[in-house]
Design a protein with these regions (language model features):
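C-terminal substrate-binding subdomain of Rossmann-fold SDR/epimerase-dehydratase oxidoreductases
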Residues: 116, 121-225
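NAD(P)H-binding glycine-rich loop region in Rossmannoid oxidoreductase-like domains
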Residues: 1-18
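Hydrophobic positions on the long internal alpha-helix
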Residues: 22, 26-30, 76-77, 139, ...
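Active-site helix of classical SDR
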Residues: 65, 69-72
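NAD(P)-dependent short-chain dehydrogenase/reductase
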Residues: 75-128, 133
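SDR active-site strand-loop-helix element
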Residues: 2-3, 38-44, 88-90
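A hydrophobic alpha-helix adjacent to the NAD(P)-binding/active-site core of NAD(P)-dependent oxidoreductases
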Residues: 15-19, 38, 66
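Conserved Rossmann-fold NAD(P)-dependent oxidoreductase catalytic core, especially the SDR/UDP-sugar
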Residues: 24-65
């Protein structure tokens, strides 16, 4: 289950209710027809943004309607009798086909290409974990093949600052890109993932390093222009 209205489509109560209605329809259908295995794509937005180190045992404590929506839909999925459920909670995902243009690799590469500059929130001090969409897909396939259930955070375990990420994006253009810092409006927050459970489940999995992933997406992007 991947369908959802993301924050760029709305952050209000009306959007929340539309997303819950989607899940209600899915649950109603599965209650009638049954299902051998349900994989629900949630979000790391279910965790409190103040929590700096996250594991699957970190209590869910969403701080906005988007996070609350995903956590509610997780509960709805788990309420289905006799349906094995896996909840995946991905960190920030990047890739060529991104439609959200969220702050990070996706926005930075587009800004660099269009404007020749990348603007950061503050000095880009915050650290976040970013995962290439191909890794998300590959891990999902493994979960399906293993009939995995429970909850799994989908992250690399390596966090970098947004300034570092901007430098990686700028490097793809031969460092001709200006990186602009701005006055900080909000406190600096950090987030790191302990991916011990993921490594135990798939010990042979190798993530695409952020530097390699951004370079790959850049090549794909330039190939389209």
């Amino acid at each position: 289950m991947l369908a959802a209205l993301t924050p760029d489509k709305g952050r209000d109560i009306a959007t929340l209710m539309k997303n819950l209605a989607m899940m209600q329809s899915v649950c109603a259908a599965l209650e009638k027809s049954g299902c051998a295995h349900l994989v629900y794509f949630s979000s790391d937005a279910v965790y409190d943004t103040a929590v700096s180190r996250v594991t699957e045992d970190t209590p869910a404590s969403p701080q906005d309607l988007y996070g609350a929506m995903h956590y509610t839909r997780e509960i709805m999925a788990r309420s289905l009798a006799k349906v094995p459920v896996l909840v995946l909670r991905p960190t920030l995902v990047y890739g060529l086909g991104d439609t959200h243009n969220s702050y990070g690799p996706n926005r930075f590469r587009r800004a660099a290409q269009k404007d020749g500059k990348i603007t950061l929130f503050g000095g880009g001090e915050e650290t976040r974990d970013h995962i290439h969409v191909d890794d998300v897909a590959a891990l999902t396939v493994r979960c399906l093949l293993h009939q995995s259930t429970g909850t799994l955070n989908v992250a690399t375990g390596i966090s970098k600052s947004f300034y570092e990420i901007a430098e990686i994006a700028a490097k793809q253009f031969g460092n001709r890109i200006e990186i602009i810092t701005t006055p900080r409006a909000n406190p600096v927050t950090q987030r790191h993932y302990d991916v011990t459970n993921l490594i135990k489940a798939f010990p042979n999995f190798r993530f695409i390093a952020l530097e390699d992933g951004v370079a790959r997406v850049h090549q794909e992007m330039m190939g389209e222009t």
